[in-house]
Amino acid sequence: MAISSLSSPSGARVSSVTVKNKVLKTPCFFLPTSRGTVPHLTPDNVEEFDIPALYVGLEDCLDRLEASPILTNEGTIKKWIAAPSVQPTLLAPRRTSPLPSVSAGQSHINIVTASGAKKLTNDLYIKAVLKLCPELVIPLNDTPTSPPGVKRKPKIVERSVNWTTELLLALKATDAFNTTKVFFPVPDLDTQYLTPIFQFFQENQLANNIAGLAFSNNVNPLPADLVGLPRLSIQKFESPLEILKCIQRGIDIIVPDMITQATDAGVALTFSFPPPSKDVLNSKIELGLDMWDERFATDMEPLQSGCVCKTCRRYKRAYVRHLLQARELVAWILLQLHNVYAFTAFFQGIRASIQEGNFDEDVRKFEEIYMTSFPASHGFGPRKRGYQMDLTNVQPVENKPAWISMKSPLEKEIANEYEALKVTERKEDTQDYNEPELHNR
C-alpha cells in the first residue's frame, strides 16, 4: 500500500491506494459507523455511494466482551454490518470520538460500551480481528482522552509497539496476513518520544507488513523511509476548513464525524471545493443550512443549488423542513443522503485542485469566502444513547422531555398547596399515634 503521490508545495498529495480489489483515490474519507451501521442509511442506500471504506469501532459491539454476539456468531465483519462484499472496512478498538475513560494498563485499554465501561485486552482484540477479517485494522493503542503526564508518555509508545507486534505475529500465523492490512497507531506526542517507533520500522522485519500510519491528532515529522506510507487521521474535525488544513499537512485519509453530526442537527451541507467566486456583497457564505429555520417553510428550492443527489433531485427545502417538524425519520434519511453526497463531491474537488496545482490558493479562498463554523441548530435531533454522551461530568440534558405540563400557573400553585397540605396531615397523624405499651409477663 505504499503511496506514490503528486504533491502541492504545502504537503497535500494525491495518489491511489489499493485495498483488496478496490482502488481508493486519495485524499479520501472513510465513513464512520455507529454500532456497525451508517447512521440513518440502510445498506442499499450505502451501496449507491462510492464510499472508499467504512470505519467500525469495535467498542460499539462489545457489550459483553468475549460473549458479545459479534464474536459468538458465525461470519466476518461484512456479514455483521451487512456491507457489500466489495466494500472495504477499517476495524479500530474505539469510536472516532471516544468518550473519556480510565487510563490503560499494560495489557488492556478501557472502552465505553452500551452496557458500561469494560476492559479490552490485546488478546481479545486480536481474537476479534482474526474472526472478523477486516481489510484494514488499527492495532490496540493507548490513546489518552486527556493530556498525558511525563511518566505515561513513554508507556504509550511502548504499548503501541508491543501490541502492534503481537497483532502482526498473530496475523502471520494465519491466512489473514495477506488479506488484513495494518495501520500503525502513531501517538500524538513530541518526536523525541517516538524514537522506539522509528526503531521498530528500521529493525523489525514485521514492519514491512505495515500498510499505513494512523494519527489521532497532529502529524509528526517522519523519517524519509516512512514518508511514502498512507496517512490516516482520526482526529475530531469541527469544520471543513480544518480538514483542508489537515490535508495540507500531508494526511491522505480522513474519518469525519461531522457528516452525521450535521444530519442529526438538521443541517444540510452546502459548501463546495474549489470555492465559488467571492460574493459582491463581501459577506461570508454559510457552510450549511439549518433546515429547522422557518424561512424554509415555503422554500421550493433544492437543499443545494446544482446538487444532483437523490434528495435534491426529488424533494424541496420546505418538504424536508416539514418532515423535521413532524419528527419523521425520513427527514434525517434525506439529509444524510445529501450530506454524504456533498462530502463525496468535496473530496473530488480536493483531488482535482491538487492535480491542477491550485490547492493552497483554493484553501486560502475557501477560508475567505466561507464561515468558520456550521449554523446553530434550532431543533432537536434523534434521541441520544448513553454511550453517545459524556457522563464523566455534569452535562446539560441531551434528550428533551417528550411532553410538558399544560397546567396554568394558578393550577400549579393550587396543586403545590394541596401536596403541602397532605404532607402536613401525615405529620400530624404520626404525632398523634402512641405506640402500645409493652407489659412484662
From Swiss-Prot:
GO terms for cellular component: cytoplasm. The gene is qtr2. Pfam families: TGT (PF01702). Signal peptide: none annotated. Keywords: Cytoplasm, Metal-binding, tRNA processing, Zinc. This is Queuine tRNA-ribosyltransferase accessory subunit 2. GO terms for biological process: maintenance of translational fidelity; tRNA-guanine transglycosylation. InterPro entries: QTRTD1 (IPR028592), Queuine_tRNA-ribosyltrfase (IPR050852), TGT-like_sf (IPR036511), tRNA_ribo_trans-like (IPR002616). Zn(2+) binds at residues 307, 309, 312, 338. It comes from Schizosaccharomyces pombe (strain 972 / ATCC 24843). Heterodimer of a catalytic subunit and an accessory subunit. One of its GO terms (molecular function) is tRNA-guanosine(34) queuine transglycosylase activity. Its cofactor is Zn(2+). Belongs to the queuine tRNA-ribosyltransferase family. QTRT2 subfamily. Non-catalytic subunit of the queuine tRNA-ribosyltransferase (TGT) that catalyzes the base-exchange of a guanine (G) residue with queuine (Q) at position 34 (anticodon wobble position) in tRNAs with GU(N) anticodons (tRNA-Asp, -Asn, -His and -Tyr), resulting in the hypermodified nucleoside queuosine (7-(((4,5-cis-dihydroxy-2-cyclopenten-1-yl)amino)methyl)-7-deazaguanosine). Binds 1 zinc ion per subunit. Its main location: cytoplasm. It is found in: Cytoplasm.
